[in-house]
Amino acid sequence: FLRLVDQARQQKFAVAVYESCQVTDLQITNAGVMIATNQDLPSETFDLAVIATGHVWPDEEEATRTYFPSPWSGLMEAKVDACNVGIMGTSLSGLDAAMAVAIQHGSFIEDDKQHVIFHRDNASEKLNITLMSRTGILPEADFYCPIPYEPLHIVTDQALNAEIQKGEEGLLDRVFRLIVEEIKFADPDWSQRIALESLNVDSFAQAWFAERKQRDPFDWAEKNLQEVERNKRENHTVPWRYVILRLHEAVQEIVPHLNEHDHKRFSKGLARVFIDNYAAIPSESIRRLLALREAGIIHILALGEDYEMEINESRTVLKTED
């Protein structure tokens, strides 16, 4: 970070860094964005304010002795007995929560070939962890790709701006047609395999997740990990993964211009694909997850779209359609 700041200043950018500076309020005015802090700083109005808050820390009062609304609401410091532990979410945050519980009841051991095993403590035989999400799908491992990103050939700034200028009606569908052409250009074989030409904004996400939904999530994670590690060794980029990663940053520019109907369609479809792609997680997290599976400790439950969560004093109960 400091190196980047230094490089920016060398190129005549004015960069100010305020450490331990808490933003207490934001006010949007006709002149710009006014920011209030807990430090005695000169009042300043900004043309653009980027809010990068990171994790949202829930109200500590929501946490109980048996319920933690996030890994950062006391779970990391709590003593969790060897019991039936349910974790909402299969993203990296959910896996972090699982690891925080697991290391209280054993240890991870890695051999020379990067294979990880989990050694459970003798007194922790009753430990059982269930990861729960609507789909039960696990994130994939970080994949190899060139950085800085290579430019897109079809979904360019000029092409997107031209579509935006045509108006919000049909904007999402027009841009999706550009996306299809970009993906076909990058990876014609994969495009043919998923029948890309037959898909639309609403069905693309279904095709993206279809094969993973049919497979055991742990088996898929193991296969994906092997592929990712092989690609890293060989400096091989998977074209369709890489083009989706680059498309995400480009396509997000149209989101403020979508009408309400298309905004909902985008959130249900393309947004989920983009999130799944860029939210890939470190290989080490996958290895530890698989180690817990091999130890018979961790399981995954797909909740479906309709479920209820009842938080009681002694336990939390989830009710699903089944």
For the regions a protein language model found, what residue spans apply to each?
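Flavin (primarily FAD) cofactor-binding/catalytic cores of flavoenzymes
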Residues: 1-322
